[in-house]
A protein has these predicted regions:
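Alpha-helix N-cap/loop-to-helix boundary motif
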Residues: 21, 44, 48, 72-76, ...
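Catalytic core of membrane glycerolipid acyltransferases/transacylases, capturing the structured
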Residues: 1-47, 91, 106-107
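Non-catalytic C-terminal accessory region of glycerolipid acyltransferases
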Residues: 13-14, 31, 35, 54-156
Length: 156
């Protein structure tokens, strides 16, 4: 979650579009991201996934840049979910892998080992090589390429 906040803060003034779940956490993040001028589409793998993705696709085609957690709201960790594959194949947009790390942080005991940087921490953001999806590319091949690009820049 704080990952999105960093991206939204750094990219203020740009047309970012975040896909956020209907959970309590998703509601909090929606309010925070919206306060930074980021457009938010709600949906999740279990509730409103198709409608949310279609709305995300429509908005993306009007000039917004989608920001998506590739392993979704429930994981498993590091496993690229179908929504990102669908969006990338339908739009042809490049997927820019982004990862961050902090010198000091609190790590939650959650499925994704969620981290929050502590005050005074040095935060580094790493961008990987773009992954370009082909409209007719096999889903598993694309999933593997995205995961590899993310793992190449991820420090646990």
């Amino acid at each position: 979650m704080t990952y999105f906040m960093k991206i939204c803060y750094v990219a203020r003034g740009h047309k970012l579009l975040v896909f956020s779940s209907y959970s309590k956490d998703g509601e909090i993040m929606t309010r925070l991201e919206s306060s930074l001028g980021t457009a938010v589409i709600r949906g999740s793998t279990s509730k409103g996934a198709i409608k949310g993705l279609i709305n995300l696709l429509r908005k993306a085609l009007t000039g917004y840049s989608p920001v998506i957690t590739p392993d979704g709201p429930r994981g498993p960790k590091y496993e690229v979910q179908d929504g990102l594959l669908f969006l990338s194949q339908k739009t042809g947009f490049p997927i820019i892998p982004i990862s961050w790390n902090a010198s000091k942080f609190y790590r939650f005991k959650s499925w994704d080992s969620f981290m929050i940087p502590l005050p005074g921490a040095r935060v580094t953001v790493t961008y990987g090589q773009p992954v370009i999806a082909q409209a007719n590319e096999d889903k598993e091949s694309l999933r593997a390429r995205i995961k590899e690009a993310l793992m190449n820049i991820t420090k646990n």
